[in-house]
Amino acid sequence: LCASIAARVPNTSIAFGIDGATGTESDRISDSRFCSQCNAPLEYDYVQYGQLGAYHCPSCGWGRPTLLRRVTGVELGCDGYGFDLAFGPEANAPAVHIATRYNGLYMVYNVAAAFFAAHELGVDAAHLQPTLDAYVPAGGRMGRWDIAGRTVEANLAKNPVGFDRQIQSIK
């Protein structure tokens, strides 16, 4: 878990993630099922996929840190996800709405990571959506083609969690 790495290094870290259950079906594959502090089984309030979600250790109390940058209001539509990026832990923190034409909950995390990092570097939030709209995946990833009247999408899965996410996106 990233939080356990952040706790071991002197660098400043900013915890971010989806703040709340999304209602999407989570997989049962997890890279991290045990507490990095005491090795007891972790408990989750909700799981997005893999090890991502709200976790805590009932044995030692270690858990997901407070999210300093939050993704809220995640909604899946026919053409991708819409969500809000909140630039603080407070309910009334400044936020911007983002829409991505790519499906897969992992894209919400990818977009959030890139945009929160850009924000930390001083990029104005007004530039976020136009930048995403101009994005073209490399190497055929997430490519879409019309073949015989149907839309075909290609994607890449490099590990069991990624493969499970692709299967879930088909459902």
Q: What kind of feature is each model-predicted range?
A:
Residues A6-A95:
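Extended acidic/charged loop-beta regions that coordinate divalent cations
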Residues S26-R33, N39, A138, L156-K171:
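Active-site beta-alpha connecting loops in nucleotide-dependent enzymes
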Residues A54-C57, A99-D133:
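A conserved, hydrophobic alpha-helical segment in the catalytic core
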Residues W62, A117-A157:
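Gly/charged, well-structured mid-domain segments that form the phosphate/adenylate-handling core
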Residues L68-R70, A99, R165-S169:
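Glycine-rich, charged/polar anion/phosphate-binding loops
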